[in-house]
């Protein structure tokens, strides 16, 4: 873990399965008070989420943050779009990468860094079905090798 990077609150394991991650960028998230309480309680889902760039600003879309149970009328919409805090040059770089290619921005994980909620955004290209099968096959082979090594070393 990098200095200051703390507790991982949510991970998007499906993203690494469905996409080739080309580049990652750390971004802050604009959250309301009850949303940050829900995030700290790990009540966040990244599975269907993605990021997009509109009018020179980055936005996180389709990320579900469950309503805070004690928040009553101050709870925000669980599916609302949330602004991502990135530097201008990072936004322009990502916007240039997204133009004309089959690239997308997916959230990979949410964690706390020095008390602030951060999201790791991945610039990703979609995998084909045969790529997914190849990844699964490679993972199974590595698992079998580890199992055999463990059995061999136990003798």
From Swiss-Prot:
A GO cellular component entry from the record: cytosol
CDD domains with a match to the protein in the record: SmpB (cd09294)
InterPro entries xref list: SmpB (IPR023620), SsrA-bd_prot (IPR000037), SsrA-bd_prot_CS (IPR020081)
Location(s), subcellular: Cytoplasm
Keyword vocabulary terms for this entry: Cytoplasm, RNA-binding
SUPFAM superfamilies linked to this entry: Small protein B (SmpB)
Keyword Nucleotide-binding tagged: no
GO terms of biological process kind: trans-translation
Major location (coarse): cytoplasm
GO molecular function: RNA binding
Source organism, top-level taxon: Bacteria
Entry function: Required for rescue of stalled ribosomes mediated by trans-translation. Binds to transfer-messenger RNA (tmRNA), required for stable association of tmRNA with ribosomes. tmRNA and SmpB together mimic tRNA shape, replacing the anticodon stem-loop with SmpB. tmRNA is encoded by the ssrA gene; the 2 termini fold to resemble tRNA(Ala) and it encodes a 'tag peptide', a short internal open reading frame. During trans-translation Ala-aminoacylated tmRNA acts like a tRNA, entering the A-site of stalled ribosomes, displacing the stalled mRNA.
Family: Belongs to the SmpB family.
Protein name as annotated: SsrA-binding protein
Organism: Streptococcus pyogenes serotype M5 (strain Manfredo)
């Amino acid at each position: 873990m990098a200095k200051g990077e703390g507790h991982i609150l949510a991970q998007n394991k499906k993203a690494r399965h469905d996409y080739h991650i080309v580049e990652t960028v750390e971004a802050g998230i604009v959250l309301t008070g009850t949303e940050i309480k829900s995030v700290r309680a790990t009540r966040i889902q990244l599975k269907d989420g993605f990021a997009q760039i509109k009018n020179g600003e980055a936005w996180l879309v389709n990320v579900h943050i469950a309503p805070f149970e004690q928040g009553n009328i101050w709870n925000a919409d669980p599916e609302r779009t949330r602004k991502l805090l990135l530097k201008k040059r990072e936004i322009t770089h990502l916007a240039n990468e997204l133009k004309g290619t089959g690239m997308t921005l997916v959230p990979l994980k949410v964690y706390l860094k020095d008390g602030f909620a951060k999201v790791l955004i991945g610039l990703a290209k979609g995998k084909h079905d045969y790529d997914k099968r190849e990844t699964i096959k490679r993972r199974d082979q590595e698992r079998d090798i580890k199992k055999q090594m463990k059995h061999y070393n136990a003798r």
